[in-house]
Amino acid sequence: MASTTLSIATTIRSSSYPTLASINHFPSRTTTIEFPSRFGGGSSSTLTHRATHLRPIAAVEAPEKIEKIGSEISSLTLEEARILVDYLQDKFGVSPLSLAPAAAAVAAPADGGAAAVVEEQTEFDVVINEVPSSSRIAVIKAVRALTSLALKEAKELIEGLPKKFKEGITKDEAEEAKKTLEEAGAKVSIA
């Protein structure tokens, strides 16, 4: 190993900036600065720390057979990969449509005895059906508390019922809004 010190040679001139005409009038000197090696100095060729091979965190233990198949598949060209996919689809009797998750939800059951997949509703609408005249003020206050509507807009909302009060909200929010409006005297439904 060569030298373990770093040398930098620099020329130091006067602190003022000389002009081109007077550049030779200032004395200059060359200074060498040496930095010690960060591995213990001297001419030691041994390192105090050694790098070790670490496996990536996402590495998966796989049998040799699987590793061999994986490396062979990864070396295929696009055309060969397409042919392999077609071959495996024919061999196992599957089609790309049968693998799509949306196709499973839309497809009808194969036999008449199987129950259809029921999709759970995630978005709800709160509908104000009726507001008795004796509780209009309380309902307007409840509407303003649940929304950011001004007094005029809240008043217009409870006229000409039934009207959707809130749309596309979660079940918990819909239940809370229904409870608040019913306590104020309105007749409310969740759709």
From Swiss-Prot:
GO terms for molecular function: mRNA binding; structural constituent of ribosome. Residues 1-58 form a transit peptide. GO terms for biological process: translation. The keyword Transcription does not apply. Keywords: Chloroplast, Plastid, Ribonucleoprotein, Ribosomal protein, Transit peptide. InterPro entries: Ribosomal_bL12, Ribosomal_bL12_C, Ribosomal_bL12_C/ClpS-like, Ribosomal_bL12_oligo, Ribosomal_bL12_oligo_N_sf. It holds the Pfam family Ribosomal_L12. One of its GO terms (cellular component) is plastid large ribosomal subunit. It comes from the Eukaryota. It is found in: Plastid, Chloroplast. Belongs to the bacterial ribosomal protein bL12 family. This is Large ribosomal subunit protein bL12cz.
